[in-house]
Swiss-Prot record:
Originating species: Mus musculus (Mouse)
Taxonomic classification: Eukaryota, Metazoa, Chordata, Craniata, Vertebrata
Membrane disposition: Multi-pass membrane protein
Post-translational modification: Palmitoylated when heterogeneously expressed in S.frugiperda cells.
Keyword Transmembrane: yes
Expression sites by tissue: Detected in duodenum, jejunum and ileum. Detected on intestinal villi and crypts (at protein level). Ubiquitous. Detected in small and large intestine, colon, jejunum, heart, kidney and lung.
Compartments where located: Cell junction, Tight junction; Cell membrane
GO molecular function: identical protein binding; paracellular tight junction channel activity; structural molecule activity
Described purpose of this protein according to its UniProt entry: Forms paracellular channels: polymerizes in tight junction strands with cation- and water-selective channels through the strands, conveying epithelial permeability in a process known as paracellular tight junction permeability. In intestinal epithelium, allows for sodium and water fluxes from the peritoneal side to the lumen of the intestine to regulate nutrient absorption and intestinal morphogenesis.
Name listed for the protein in its UniProt record: Claudin-15
Keywords recorded for this protein, A-Z: Cell junction, Cell membrane, Disulfide bond, Ion transport, Lipoprotein, Membrane, Palmitate, Phosphoprotein, Tight junction, Transmembrane, Transmembrane helix, Transport
Extracellular side: 25-74, 141-159
Important for the formation of tight-junction strand-like structures as annotated region, ranges: 146-147
TM segment ranges: 2-24, 75-99, 116-140, 160-182
């Protein structure tokens, strides 16, 4: 049962990592909204790297942010957290692939595989946590500006990339928990194989006849029985 759980957790973490990569490259982290009586013909959408505008004809024009130092602090922080999440996810995916009991890499015993699974599960949990913090931090800034009556700039709504990122982070965390929870079970299996108990062959003991028994058996026959 634990083999199925750790395999399921491994693929769940891999799916979460893939979705985190798609979230980072998605253009729709936030989308401009029509707020109040102002009528606009352009739709603006942004992510962590660039901003785009779509006119009434459906033509989109994108431009990169001018300077990293000119960006808001939360955008730079979200960039760092998302990149960290993907790097941790890749490292956890590699260690988990080696530590799975259905794989045979380097003829490792179960105790070493259990340690690798524990590290891989921890990395996936940290990756999901980094992604969750980055997405939530970005969403909080969107909602803060949206409900601020003194904010005179363009107001945005949550883009579909944020919902994808939340789902990806949750999958990474759940997959990491599944992988981490099976490391104790895998280290306890096959104790006799890991202990290397010595083999003692069985011996057969043949009882020897005593002197009294030999005298009794000799007395059963008379002297005339021997030639």
């Amino acid at each position: 049962m634990s083999v199925a759980v750790e395999t399921f957790g491994f693929f769940m973490s891999a799916l979460g990592l893939l979705m985190l990569g798609l979230t980072l490259s998605n253009s729709y982290w936030r989308v401009s909204t029509v707020h109040g009586n102002v009528i606009t013909t352009n739709t603006i959408f942004e992510n962590l790297w660039y901003s785009c505008a779509t006119d009434s004809l459906g033509v989109s024009n994108c431009w990169d942010f001018p300077s990293m130092l000119a960006l808001s602090g939360y955008v730079q922080g979200c960039r760092a957290l998302m990149i960290t999440a993907i790097l941790l996810g890749f490292l956890g995916l590699f260690l988990g692939m080696v530590g799975l009991r259905c794989t045979n890499v380097g003829n490792m015993d179960l105790s070493k595989k259990a340690k690798l699974l524990a590290i891989a599960g921890t990395l996936h949990i940290l990756a999901g946590a980094c992604g969750m913090v980055a997405i939530s931090w970005y969403a909080v800034n969107i909602t803060t500006d949206f409900f601020n009556p003194l904010y005179a700039g363009t107001k945005y709504e949550l883009g579909p990339a944020l919902y994808l990122g939340w789902s990806a982070s949750l999958l990474s965390i759940l997959g990491g928990i599944c992988v981490f929870s099976t490391c104790c079970c895998s280290s306890k299996e096959e104790p006799a194989t890991r202990a290397g108990l010595p083999y003692k062959p069985s011996t057969v003991v043949i009882p020897r006849a005593t002197s009294d028994e030999s005298d009794i058996s000799f007395g059963k026959y008379g002297k005339n029985a021997y030639v």
